[in-house]
UniProtKB/Swiss-Prot annotation:
Organism: Trichormus variabilis (strain ATCC 29413 / PCC 7937)
GO cellular component, one term: cytosol
Protein name: Leucine--tRNA ligase
Main location: cytoplasm
Family stated for the protein in its record: Belongs to the class-I aminoacyl-tRNA synthetase family.
One Pfam entry name: Anticodon_1
UniProtKB keywords: Aminoacyl-tRNA synthetase, ATP-binding, Cytoplasm, Ligase, Nucleotide-binding, Protein biosynthesis
Length: 872
């Protein structure tokens, strides 16, 4: 037996043994309750970072715990393997995307296996594998059959030099292409969408079912769905039979409309534009349509517009108001038109100030209209009194309506209902529920993604690829230049096919799917990953789902999680699933931060100095010698503050890295990397190693004493079972790994300080410590368990249950106070009642001295804690 803790040797040994034993394979015993533990699968970039290590360690602890608690556990891993980086690698290095991706997968799989994670690799999937994207394509066809997939024109980022579509991340802050440097244009292309809006109400309402999700994530999703109840109103165009439809959540402000705004893409722009304004409007539209949505709606940019020369009629007042076109109105939102009410909307207020448009206040704060008579003179008359109230900024709060005809004097709440009712009766409006959520654009004009499985036939239209012809395989004989649009569209031998329905010459769809499609159902495939006959066997998937614990970053709070919920509901409605939500509990782990240096005189936080170039004891700019400032920031290559997992493992071992990551911060908080704290965890594991190996080396044979345990034995047994209780609660309730490890440290200290190391209680403590340590530091726990003479794996042991009787102390410490000041503490029987506690307190010699000659006015007894004498 080696007296030294050598993590490198024992970790390699046990990882190999666990594979041979099949210890991590998914158990299928139906008599056990199931537990599905899942981390969000990674993109195969080729190297793990500390964020990965934290994510997968958290899930691994949970999976190991649940196995020991008697659950059959599914803990799989896969690869979110389609995406732009592989295509860029093909362009830059001449390496086929598949080669680059699979090479990275091999490398990262080895890195993950080096972490000793209890992953069932038999369930591994890669979204770029035809075995996987065959079923991605099949699911798309389910959407198509259900009427949930359709095509329409939508704007894309277009590089006019390379003649190709760009992703948003390929456009820099100046609106230029990352590769050619050309100013990016907006271009309309026919694209595929999924009707997620059909599920908007259910996606919103079912957030209430997600009691195991962080509230902030649910709020983010609710805001993204963006349900609002408002009014649909029609403004007739002067000189035309057409009407401009607007949607507003503030119909109570309609009497304050001073202009109407159309989106530049609105089909009525040509009709409302006068001849004198045509050239100005055309120029403006050209400028705006080349801007991204983010640019147009950015809060910090002034909103721009141009008058069309046309006018619309406010249906409530009969007054004509000018029609404008503005960059901040998007055709995809609402009706593509808004009513401008500058007095009661901040954005409209700034726009009106910039273009000198009227600002008419029609709502006022209740206190500001207290002196006005806003009652109609009769039931048939309107309030005629004009209320002159102005504010120096937009008044956006609810209030009392003024200068609003028959609705003057009403509260905003009452007026909204009355105005919508009036508009409905008159036929120029109605109540309307609207969502911020828009249908999901899934088309990508790129190669490295799942091909959309449809064929375009001049006779039959859109024809689904028959199931027997799936998957539509990505061709390998493709040239990657970064120019000329989608590589697939340029490969005629792949594009040109006969129509499956009529046999006429037809063409394949050349768009591939958004990679979010792949990750919207992978958790379902894990439950039946080797099924070649169907997407998954419903009985298996319904058995394992929903995922009991999902772990991933807050950056996926909206899109990935929302799309996964959407897919689950659609597949449920297609009869494949029998549950509503995919993820029972969600843990969004914090970021891993490293110490970062910057020179405040040389670009500040925009110019980081790599930490390996800095002396941490005297941080100075290596070029100028100037003092550097430091802060903790998320680890990244650009900041030069990353810590390579393999370096930490080589120096300290996997278990130390796990222990540090789990101990340093609660899982939902950001974690600051600190080498000194890593050392601290290494020292703790060394102490545990010595504690157990010394016990084994002593060769003691625990005495099988009969009768009462000694006081020291009772105290030690109390410490043991207190640790069991605390660690279990910390792991089951809120996953407070840091406090659970603190309890292990307490138990270790109690065992170190204990007398009677030949007692059965001490043996119980040693064995319990190793078992409790197993989910956190699996390798050292396994080695120590074997050294203790056990033949079976520690990870197959039953998780210990605490004995409530062991937690009850024979004696407790009673604090005695006089007038609230502590004067003594004494040991008393734990079962003593109030009268007995007061008696013991009065008998204390120290207290008697403080009570001598004084009148006791009151005695306060708090059972199990204190006695307080109030004296005069």
């Amino acid at each position: 037996m080696d007296s030294r803790y050598n993590p490198a040797i024992l970790e390699e040994k046990w990882q190999k043994t666990w594979v041979e034993l099949g210890l991590d394979k998914t158990q299928t015993q139906s008599n056990k309750p199931k537990f599905y533990a899942l981390s969000m699968f990674p993109y195969p970039s080729g190297s793990l970072h500390m964020g990965h290590v934290r994510n997968y360690t958290i899930t691994d602890v949970i999976a190991r715990l649940k196995r020991m608690q008697g659950y059959r556990v599914l803990h799989p891993m896969g690869w979110d393997a389609f995406g732009l980086p592989a295509e860029n690698a093909a362009i830059d290095r001449g390496v086929p995307p598949a080669n680059w991706t699979y090479q990275n997968i091999t490398q990262m799989r080895q890195q993950l296996q080096r972490l000793g994670l209890s992953i069932d690799w038999d369930s591994e999937v890669a979204t770029c594998s035809p075995d996987y994207y065959k079923w991605t394509q099949w699911i798309f066809l389910q959407f198509l059959q259900a009427g949930l997939a359709y095509q329409k024109e939508a704007a894309v980022n277009w590089d006019p030099i390379d003649q190709t579509v760009l992703a948003n991340e390929q456009v820099d802050n100046e609106g230029r292409s990352w590769r050619s440097g050309a100013i990016v244009e907006r271009k309309l292309l026919r694209q595929w969408f999924l009707k997620i809006t059909d599920y908007a109400e259910e996606l919103l309402n079912d957030l209430d079912k997600l009691t195991g999700w962080p509230e902030r994530v649910k709020l983010m999703q609710a805001n993204w769905i963006g349900k609002s109840v408002g009014a649909y109103l029609e403004f007739p165009i002067v000189g035309s039979t057409e009407k401009i439809a607007v949607y507003t959540t503030r119909p109570d402000t309609v009497y304050g409309v001073s202009y109407v705004v159309l989106a530049p893409e609105h089909p009525l722009t040509k009709q409302v534009t006068s001849k004198t304004q045509q050239a100005v409007v055309d120029t403006f539209i050209q400028e705006v349509t080349n801007q991204s949505e983010l640019e147009r709606t950015a809060e910090d940019k002034p909103k721009r517009g141009v008058a069309t020369g046309g006018k619309a009629i406010n249906p409530f007042t009969g007054e004509e108001v000018p029609i404008w076109i503005a960059d901040y109105v998007l055709y995809e939102y609402g009706t593509g038109a808004v009513m401008g009410v500058p007095a009661h909307d901040v954005r409209d207020f700034k726009f009106a100030q910039r273009y000198d448009l009227p600002i008419d206040f029609v709502i006022a704060a209740p206190d500001d209209v207290a002196g006005f008579d806003l009652s109609p003179t009769s039931e048939t008359e309107e309030v005629t009194q004009v209320v002159q109230i102005e504010y120096n900024q937009a008044y956006t709060e609810p209030g009392i309506l003024i200068n609003s005809g028959a609705f003057t004097g009403m509260t905003s709440t009452d007026a909204k209902q009355a105005i919508v009712k009036y508009a409905t009766e008159k036929g120029f409006g109605k109540e309307r529920i609207q969502y911020r959520l828009r249908d999901w654009l899934i088309s990508r004009q790129r190669y490295w993604g799942a091909p959309i499985p449809v064929i375009h036939c001049p006779n039959c239209g859109i024809v689904p690829v028959p199931d027997k012809d799936l998957p539509v395989i990505l061709p390998e004989e493709v040239e990657f230049t970064g120019r000329g649009g989608s590589p697939l569209a340029q490969l005629e031998s792949w594009v040109n096919v006969p129509c499956p329905t009529c046999g006429s010459p037809a063409k394949r769809e050349t768009d591939t799917m958004d990679t979010f499609i792949d990750s919207s159902w992978y958790f379902l495939r894990f439950t039946d990953a080797r099924n070649e006959a169907q997407v998954f066997e419903s009985a298996k998937t319904n058995d394992w789902m929903p995922v009991d614990q999902y772990v991933g970053g807050i950056e996926h709070a909206i899109l990935h999680l929302l799309y996964s919920r959407f897919f689950t509901k659609v597949l449920r409605d297609r009869g494949l699933l029998n549950f509503d939500e995919p993820f029972e509990r969600l843990l969004t782990q914090g970021m891993v931060q490293g110490l970062t240096y910057f020179n405040p005189n040389k670009g500040g936080k925009d110019k980081w100095v790599p930490s390996h170039l800095v002396n941490p004891n005297d941080p100075r700019d290596p070029q100028t010698g100037e003092p550097l400032q430091r802060l903790y920031a998320t680890m990244s290559k650009s900041k030069g503050n990353g810590v390579a997992p393999e370096d930490v493992i080589a120096k300290y071992g996997v278990d130390t890295a796990r222990m540090f990551i789990l101990f340093k911060a609660p899982p939902e908080k950001d974690l600051e990397w600190d080498e000194a704290d890593v050392e601290g965890q290494f020292r703790f594991l060394n102490r545990v190693w010595r504690l157990v190996t010394d016990y084994v080396a002593s060769g003691v044979n625990p005495k099988n004493k009969s009768g009462e345990l000694s006081k020291s034995e009772k105290d030690l047994r109390r410490a043991i079972h207190s640790a069991i209780q605390s660690v279990t609660e910390d792991l089951e309730d809120e996953y407070q790994f840091n406090t659970a490890i603190s309890e292990l440290m307490k138990l270790s200290n109690a065992l170190t300080d204990a007398n009677g190391k030949d007692s059965r209680v001490y043996a119980e403590g040693i064995h319990t410590l190793v078992v409790l340590l197993a989910p956190f530091a699996p390798h050292i726990a396994e080695e120590l368990w074997q050294l203790l003479g056990n033949s079976e794996s520690v990870h197959t042991q039953t998780w210990p249950a605490f004995d409530p009787a062991a937690l009850v102390a024979d004696e407790i410490t009673l604090v005695i106070q006089v007038n609230g000041k502590k004067r003594a503490d004494i040991q008393v029987p734990s079962q003593a009642d109030k009268a007995e506690l007061e008696k013991y307190a009065r008998e204390s010699e120290v207290v008697q001295r403080h009570l001598e000659g004084k009148e006791i006015k009151k005695v306060i007894v708090v059972p199990g804690k204190l006695v307080n004498f109030v004296v005069g």
